UniProtKB/Swiss-Prot annotation:
Region (Disordered) residue spans: 62-81
Protein modification: Ubiquitinated independently by RKP and SCF (SKP1-CUL1-FBL5/SKP2B) protein ligase complex, leading to proteasomal degradation.
Induction info: By abscisic acid (ABA).
Gene: KRP1
Disruption phenotype: No visible phenotype.
One Gene Ontology cellular component: nucleoplasm
GO biological process: lateral root development; lateral root formation; leaf development; negative regulation of cyclin-dependent protein serine/threonine kinase activity; positive regulation of DNA replication; response to abscisic acid; shoot system development
Function: Binds and inhibits CYCD2-1/CDKA-1 kinase complex activity. Regulates cell division which is crucial for plant growth, development and morphogenesis. Functions in turning cells from a mitotic to an endoreplicating cell cycle mode. Acts cell- and non-cell-autonomously to regulate endoreduplication by allowing S phase progression, but blocking entry into mitosis. Keeps on the one hand the plant cell cycle locally controlled, and on the other hand provides a possibility of linking cell cycle control in single cells with the supracellular organization of a tissue or an organ.
Lineage: Eukaryota, Viridiplantae, Streptophyta, Embryophyta, Tracheophyta
Impact when changing K84A: Affects transport to nucleus, but does not abolish it
Gene3D superfamilies: p27
Note: Plants overexpressing ICK1/KRP1 show altered morphology (including flowers) with a reduction in plant size, cell numbers, pollen germination, seed production and CDK kinase activity. Trichome cells misexpressing ICK1/KRP1 show reduced endoreduplication and cell size, and undergo cell death. ICK1/KRP1 degradation is regulated by the AXR1-dependent RUB conjugation pathway that is required for the function of the SCF complexes.
Organism from which the protein derives: Arabidopsis thaliana (Mouse-ear cress)
Protein name in UniProt: Cyclin-dependent kinase inhibitor 1
């Protein structure tokens, strides 16, 4: 007994169940074969992807077909919630794996291409390794040229003397001896 249902895009035989979903931005058709545990997804743009599961997954699955319209133009498959969730999880995992594999391949290809281009066309220029070692040498050179403790102490002693001299001129007061000096301010001792 082979019954055919007319779908939005194509014909589906009775031995194959399918789900038609209308999302906000696109339509998705899920086609599942009863003989195998594979699932194919056909998007609105015509791109299809597939996912396969184990035999236990197939046995646990309940599929009920319902006709939406009386004339039989469209149909939907209603899965148990857990089955839908597993279907989407499997699809997401597969997409993530494919993406990570393609990114790994791309990055390794890019690195090898960069090395080859540096080796063949830039023989007069510094390579990445040479640049890194030059920067490390500069850092090491700066570390060896650090001032000693006595030089640092002398620097701050001189700065402190200059600051005291500045206050002495500005406020006409000797802060070391704590005595007023002659100048624009007149100091009065408080009792």
């Amino acid at each position: 007994m082979v019954r055919k249902y007319r779908k939005a895009k194509g014909i589906v035989e009775a031995g194959v169940s399918s789900t038609y979903m209308q999302l906000r931005s696109r339509r998705i058709v899920y086609v599942r074969s009863e003989k195998s545990s594979s699932v194919s997804v056909v998007g609105d743009n015509g791109v299809s992807s597939s996912c396969s599961g184990s035999n236990e997954y197939k046995k646990k699955e309940l599929i009920h077909l319902e006709e939406e319209d009386k004339d039989g133009d469209t149909e939907t498959s209603t899965y148990r919630r857990g089955t839908k969730r597993k279907l989407f999880e499997n699809l997401r995992e597969e997409e993530k794996e494919e993406l990570s594999k393609s990114m790994e391949n791309y990055s390794s290809e890019f690195e090898s291409a960069v090395k080859e281009s540096l080796d063949c066309c830039c023989s007069g220029r510094k390579t990445m390794e040479e640049t890194v070692t030059a920067e490390e040498e500069e850092k090491a050179k700066l570390m060896t040229e650090m001032p000693t403790e006595s030089e640092i102490e002398d620097f701050f002693v001189e700065a402190e003397k200059q600051l005291k001299e500045k206050f002495k001129k500005k406020y006409n007061f000797d802060f070391e001896k704590e005595k007023p000096l002659e100048g624009r301010y007149e100091w009065v001792k408080l009792e």
